[in-house]
Amino acid sequence: MAYYNNPANLQYYDYSYTADNSFNTQSRAAGFYDEPLHEPLSQGWLAAFSTSGYPGEPSLLEELEINFGHIKQKTTHVLNPFKHVDVHIMDDTDMAGPILFCLLFSTFLSLHGRSHFGYIYGIALLGSLSLHFVLRLMSAKNLFFTRTVSVLGYSLLPLVVIAFFKNIFTFNGIAGYALAALACIWCTYAASAMFVGILQVNNMRFLVAYPIALFYGVFAVITVFSK
């Protein structure tokens, strides 16, 4: 007990570092937190319309999974359906292109007469579900519904062009019917080529194309006879 009560034992505790080192530690810590970790963002209500962000932050288009390069590649393939189909062309099942083409198709038809947004979206949804179910029965490969919608949406482009020109020319004759039928065949050929490449069913091209032709045939009829 005498040993612990002896004040001389306190000489073994060195307090010489506390004054200077604590000051240096606190100053370094303060300097660390004072340094900005990133560039300051713009302030005010205009900041909501700016494109500034944190360094390394993905852009808004990347977060929305919108890639204009992929949209251009798939659109080019639809415009040139005789081109060799890459089996990985639809690995990124973006929905920006199909939604854009569907909106354009509905808008062009509404400019000519009554609005057909409800009919077009209903037929597109029901037809996509039916085709997805049929195509999954034809192949053992896994086919996602978003990929089916993406292929069908991109392949709608020829009929979108027909709907645009209907606002300029009349399609109430043999020439108009022939152009609509040609666009339907074009859509069917492009979509069936991509589905055959994705599902690897080269010997079932006609079976794949038949239900797709019925799907685009409905849109062709709406395009020709809409008033």
UniProtKB/Swiss-Prot annotation:
Cellular component aspect of the GO annotation:
endoplasmic reticulum membrane; Golgi membrane; trans-Golgi network
Task: Tell me the domain of life.
Answer: Eukaryota
Topology within the bilayer:
Multi-pass membrane protein
Where is this chain primarily localised? endoplasmic reticulum
One of the record's GO molecular function terms = small GTPase binding
* Sorted UniProt keywords: Endoplasmic reticulum, ER-Golgi transport, Golgi apparatus, Membrane, Protein transport, Transmembrane, Transmembrane helix, Transport
The compartments listed are: Endoplasmic reticulum membrane; Golgi apparatus membrane
Tell me where the transmembrane regions lie. 93-113, 115-135, 151-171, 179-199, 206-226
For the Cytoplasmic compartment, the record's topological domain ranges are 1-92, 136-150, 200-205
**An annotated GO BP:** endoplasmic reticulum to Golgi vesicle-mediated transport
One family from Pfam that matches here is: Yip1
- Which of the residues are on side Lumenal? 114, 172-178, 227
Which family is annotated?
Belongs to the YIP1 family.
What role does it play? Required for fusion of ER-derived vesicles with the Golgi during ER-to-Golgi protein transport, probably by mediating correct membrane localization of ypt1.
Assembly and partners are described as: Component of the YIP1-YIF1 complex, composed of at least yif1, yip1 and yos1. The complex interacts with the ER to Golgi SNAREs bos1 and sec22. Interacts with the prenylated form of the Rab GTPases ypt1 and ypt3.
Annotated protein name in UniProt: Protein transport protein yip1
Q: Which organism is it from?
A: Schizosaccharomyces pombe (strain 972 / ATCC 24843)
